Regions:
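A cross-kingdom feature marking solvent-exposed beta-strand/loop segments within repeated
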Residues: 1-8, 16-52, 74, 112-136
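Short, structured motif recognition centered on aromatic/hydrophobic residues
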Residues: 6-11, 18-25, 54-64, 88-93, ...
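Short, solvent-exposed interaction modules
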Residues: 62-113
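A short secondary-structure junction motif
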Residues: 67-71, 126, 149
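Short, Lys/Arg-rich amphipathic alpha-helical interaction segments
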Residues: 131, 135-153
């Protein structure tokens, strides 16, 4: 999944308009114009399409955490320079205040069965012997399950 796909999916799941999206970026200390946001949200084959880079997506996810959980006291965390699916999944879990069992249920809503041990392997340090890279399929199914839960209730 591309960063733009993730941004589009989260926007759809939460039914956010442009103003809300721009305020989420702003809460994480990144000013984004409506024009810039529009370019990130366009289909990949559109001539005006622009790639959303890792620090920009990390800033959005930090802003989403601020929006959903409240802004932390003190300085805003610096956005990661490089994102992995593992980090994205972790940030989404924090934003939506999800525990491991909640994530497993969301994956089941998307017809994907993952054990608790497999899930915990995604959140280990990369140099840990049981670390496992989160594949795009897992992230895609997590977002699908989140969509079923939040849009169909």
């Amino acid at each position: 999944m591309t960063n733009n796909d993730i941004l589009r999916r989260v926007r759809y799941i939460l039914d956010f308009n442009d103003d809300k999206m721009m305020s989420i970026f702003k809460s994480a200390e990144l000013e984004v114009s409506r024009d810039q946001l529009s370019k990130w949200l366009k289909k990949d084959d559109d001539t005006d399409f622009e790639n959303l880079n890792d620090p920009q997506l990390a800033t959005f996810l930090n802003g989403l955490i601020n929006e959903k959980r409240g802004k932390r006291e003190g300085e805003q965390p610096a956005p990661e320079k490089s994102l992995t699916n593992n980090i994205i999944l972790r940030k989404l879990m924090i934003a939506f205040n999800l525990k491991s069992d909640d994530v497993l249920k969301l994956l089941e809503l998307a017809d994907l069965r993952v054990s608790k041990h497999e899930l915990s392997a995604f959140f280990r340090k990369p140099n840990h012997k049981n670390y496992r890279e989160c594949q795009s399929q897992i992230l895609r199914n997590f977002l699908s399950g989140l969509q079923v839960k939040l849009r169909n209730t």
